[in-house]
């Protein structure tokens, strides 16, 4: 018996300025991170088939909070603050980076990190920093090269191979795929990846259900 995750049922739970204001550190969380213009909100909306689950800001750098969404019992998606926007004051940038690093290094229920980057400008310094933090904490990483529809097929494949080669040098579990919120490219693969990361929480749910059924 298996549980199918219905990502369209995902709903907003809470926002927090840092790890100390998040709910209890339990279940499984999968975090989404990316530069302010990487298309993170659009990717989350496409993943869940909801137009406004994650608010797409006209002004990059506005999302300063950690946003928590419930997918199903024991399974959560975390939308981390966008980083790397030039017009944000340095003090605020440093605060965000500290908050991001703290979350990636100390949150016990974090079991997967999705790093989104524009396929035309991949693997900037902060993107690589996020991946290094995850690897240090033994968290698997899924890199999504977003806005893949902006490149023709040949250029898209070449960029994918280049980033995959770079990802091999990180030394951790880092997978790289292309993604297009507009065309739906890579959406099914992303759902399949999240399914595997969420699987342990769903297994606990099944055990609890079977236990309560046998008790009856």
From Swiss-Prot:
What UniProt keywords are attached to this protein's entry? Cell cycle, Cell division, GTP-binding, Magnesium, Metal-binding, Nucleotide-binding, Septation
Q: Which positions bind Mg(2+)?
A: 41, 63
Q: Which cofactor does it need?
A: Mg(2+)
Q: Which residues bind GTP?
A: 34-41, 61-65, 79-82, 146-149, 179-181
Q: Which GO terms describe its cellular component?
A: cytosol
Biological process (GO) annotations held by this record are: division septum assembly
UniProt domain EngB-type G: residue ranges: 26-200
> What's a Pfam family this protein contains?
MMR_HSR1
Report the PROSITE patterns cross-referenced here.
G_ENGB
* A GO MF term: metal ion binding
The record's family statement is: Belongs to the TRAFAC class TrmE-Era-EngA-EngB-Septin-like GTPase superfamily. EngB GTPase family.
State the protein's purpose. Necessary for normal cell division and for the maintenance of normal septation.
Query: What is the protein named?
Result: Probable GTP-binding protein EngB
Q: What's the source species for this entry?
A: Vibrio vulnificus (strain CMCP6)
């Amino acid at each position: 018996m298996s549980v199918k995750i219905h990502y369209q049922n995902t709903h907003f739970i809470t926002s927090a300025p840092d790890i100390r204001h998040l709910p209890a550190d339990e279940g499984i969380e999968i975090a989404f991170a990316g530069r302010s213009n990487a298309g993170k909100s659009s990717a989350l909306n496409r993943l869940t088939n909801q137009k406004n689950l994650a608010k797409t800001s006209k002004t990059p750098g506005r999302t300063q909070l950690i946003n928590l969404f419930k997918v199903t019992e024991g399974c959560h998606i975390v939308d981390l603050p966008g980083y790397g926007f030039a017009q944000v004051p340095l003090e605020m940038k440093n605060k965000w980076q500290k908050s991001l690093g703290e979350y990636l290094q100390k949150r016990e229920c974090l079991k997967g990190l999705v790093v989104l980057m524009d396929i035309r400008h991949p693997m900037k310094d902060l993107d690589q920093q996020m991946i290094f933090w995850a690897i240090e904490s033994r968290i698997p990483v899924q890199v999504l090269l977003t806005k893949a529809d902006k490149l023709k097929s040949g250029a898209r494949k070449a960029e994918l191979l280049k980033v995959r080669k770079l990802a091999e040098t990180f030394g951790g579990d880092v997978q790289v795929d292309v993604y297009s919120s507009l065309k739906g490219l890579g959406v099914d693969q992303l759902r399949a990846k999240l399914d595997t990361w969420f699987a342990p929480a769903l297994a606990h749910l099944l055990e609890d259900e079977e236990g309560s059924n046998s008790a009856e």
